[in-house]
A protein has these predicted regions:
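Terminal low-complexity/charged segments
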Residues: 1-207
Length: 207
């Protein structure tokens, strides 16, 4: 692996069952081609997008009394305003499998800093990337440059936003209702409010 990829700027980490390679988006096409052609990673098993916004932060940071359900004594996480750039926020993980060598490999690449965030499409290398990339586009808003048919695949065409982003409101932007006067289904702003959905667990610092 190191011999084939020695000319690229990569970071390699290993555990008992998997190898992970972190690369720059500019090298994605060349590295992916080398992995398939020279190292027999014939199959792309999955494409996973991750949003690192507020990574490591938690809502439950309080020693106050608890008495009002899940919303008790909680200070909600503050989501920053969306900037024009996304430095270090979105990453894409490609899960590869070499059947002939019985080896798994994870390829990790952070997206461009542009808005929308983007990486090159790997459809021309592994055809299975087609719907995986469409899913990541639909749910995370990541653009895959060169994809032949990049459109939503899980949400409907009237959907606003990308629901797996951490700054997407948990109650959504729109709801679908039946309008009795128009006698048709219509979109309208959501009519519910949000609150923390995870109970607080109190632990003794000495445990």
């Amino acid at each position: 692996l190191e011999a084939v990829l020695q000319k690229y700027e990569i970071e390699v980490s290993m555990n008992q069952s998997n190898v992970e390679i972190k690369i720059n988006p500019e090298q994605l096409i060349e590295v992916a081609t080398a992995l398939k052609s020279n190292l027999s990673f014939e199959l792309l098993m999955d494409v996973i997008a991750v949003d690192y916004l507020t990574y490591g932060d938690v809502d439950w940071k309080t020693n106050n009394a608890t008495s009002t359900g899940y919303s008790r004594a909680v200070k909600p996480t503050i989501i920053p305003e969306i900037d024009e750039t996304f430095k270090g926020r979105f990453a894409v993980f490609y899960q590869l499998l070499s059947v002939s060598n019985n080896q798994r490999l994870t390829l990790k690449v952070f997206t461009s800093e542009s808005n929308p965030p983007s990486v090159p499409s790997l459809v021309n290398i592994w055809s299975s990337a087609d719907w995986y990339e469409r899913e990541a586009f639909d749910l995370m808003g990541i653009h895959f440059d060169g994809h032949p048919d990049l459109r939503r695949i899980l949400t409907d065409y009237g959907f606003i936003g990308h629901p797996f982003r951490k700054d997407f409101p948990t109650n959504g932007n729109l709801e679908v209702v039946y309008d009795e006067e128009k006698e048709e289904v219509v979109y309208q702003p959501v009519s519910i409010s949000t609150r923390p959905g995870v109970p607080r667990v109190i632990r003794d610092r000495n445990d």
